[in-house]
Amino acid sequence: MALNNNRFVVLSFRLILSFFFLLSAYGKLVDIERYSVDAVYNFGILPMVLARPFGLVMPFIELFCGMGMLFGVFTRLSALGIGLMSLSFFIAKAIVLSQGRTIDCGCFGAVIDTLASVTIFFDLPIMFIAMTVMWAPSEVRYWKTLGNLLPSKWKERLRLIW
């Protein structure tokens, strides 16, 4: 049986992703300038004109994706967002490490100090977990969710982005 056809596996994956991304968003939103904007600057990959807006928006995207996974609403969109963020985090950390620099990646903001050399090993498994949730059939992906409480006509309209 494929992992993405097992309701318990997909629910577990959703809760794991939710935990990590809600924790990450919280840690950055405590002091967004210090823990998100400065972390993006420290990577030195984005141009200065893009680093600040990216640092300001990223915690809110993490919050949206984490809430989507927790409540089972927009899970496909949330999983896609988590997968793309994990891929971009992996690439950014790989670039920094290839330059021989050691930085705090800012992954969990004020909650935990994290080095890019350590957290890079979590990015690809998180991406795999997110893609497993994204490709799960909707009856598996939405098992035990708030999405089941919506009227059926809304479910049909939202099925494409869910």
Language-model region placement:
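Solvent-exposed, well-ordered loop and adjacent helix/strand elements within mature globular domains
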Residues: 20-58
